[in-house]
UniProtKB/Swiss-Prot annotation:
Gene Ontology BP terms: lipid A biosynthetic process
Database matches in Pfam families: Acetyltransf_11, Hexapep
The protein, known as: Acyl-[acyl-carrier-protein]--UDP-N-acetylglucosamine O-acyltransferase
Assigned keywords, A-Z: Acyltransferase, Cytoplasm, Lipid A biosynthesis, Lipid biosynthesis, Lipid metabolism, Repeat, Transferase
Primary gene name: lpxA
Length: 262
């Protein structure tokens, strides 16, 4: 049986699984879908065309599915889609997409979103991502799986944060962070490969060694960007255990629109 506090407001049309728990003074809009075993904290607002999967935990005073902070937005029925097993802590704001992009803001599974985080319209957040308290994502930001963003950091619109990368606290990021790379500062600069994170996630010593070699080519050997890309492609085809990881790095760089941090 759904446990809805008597002070909560669940508008007609909302689709709520019978195992959902909704706390005091929470508001759930008419176009919201909430999956099994999800809990909605007190005073939080779930609105817009928002879909929450299973086993999510929404903290007190969170605002999920609000209107995009985009002056071009004209009340189009854009969406927010959140997967399973996400923790979204107090006072977080997550907005729906815009028709100027694909119209959907997405969060995957198993993400840890700490207090006061902002995830703007049309953002794409992968799986197992950590966004620390007060991290601020502008519109259209893409965050790869297992990435970490430190507290009090700001990320410019359309920036991409690669898988397994890490952005240090109180940083300002205006260009893409390649996968596996640590960055920090205002403006953010590269500070090596995220070796400890890769070890924890089961990357082999050979793969980590290959990524370290790739980092040296990209940042330490005095090569031009185009020269570095040529040698990175050669490294990705070396026939070693790290080829797949280096190929991921190369493909990310090739797809960059804003350029990577240098």
């Amino acid at each position: 049986m759904t446990r809805i506090h008597p002070t909560a407001i669940v508008e007609p049309g909302a689709q709520i699984d019978e195992s959902v728990e909704i706390g005091p003074y929470a508001i759930v809009g008419p176009h919201v879908t909430i999956g099994a075993r999800t809990t909605i904290g007190s005073h939080s607002v779930i609105e817009g065309h928002t879909t929450l999967g299973e086993d999510n935990r929404i903290g007190h005073y969170a605002s999920v599915g609000g209107r995009p902070q985009d002056m071009k937005y004209k009340d189009e029925p854009t969406k927010l889609v959140i997967g399973n097993r996400n923790t979204i802590r107090e006072f977080t704001t997550i907005h729906t997409g815009t028709v100027q992009d694909v119209g959907v803001t997405t969060l995957g599974d198993d993400n840890w979103i700490m207090a006061y985080v902002h995830i703007g319209h049309d953002c794409t957040v992968g799986n197992h991502v950590i966004l620390s308290s007060n991290a601020q994502m502008a519109g259209h930001v893409e965050i790869g799986d297992w990435a970490i963003v430190g507290g009090m950091s700001g990320v410019h619109q359309f920036v991409r944060i690669g898988a397994h990368s890490m952005l240090g606290g109180a940083s300002a990021l205006v260009q893409d962070i390649p996968p596996f790379v640590i960055a920090a500062g205002n403006k953010a600069e590269p500070h090596g490969i995220n070796v400890e994170g890769l070890r924890r996630r089961g990357f082999s010593p050979d793969a980590i060694s290959a990524l370290r070699s790739a980092y040296r080519l990209l940042y330490k050997n005095g090569l031009s960007f185009e020269e570095a890309k040529v040698q990175l492609r050669e490294l990705a085809a070396a026939g070693g255990e790290g080829d797949a990881a280096v190929k991921t790095l190369v493909e990310f760089i090739d797809a960059s629109q804003r350029g990577i941090i240098r």
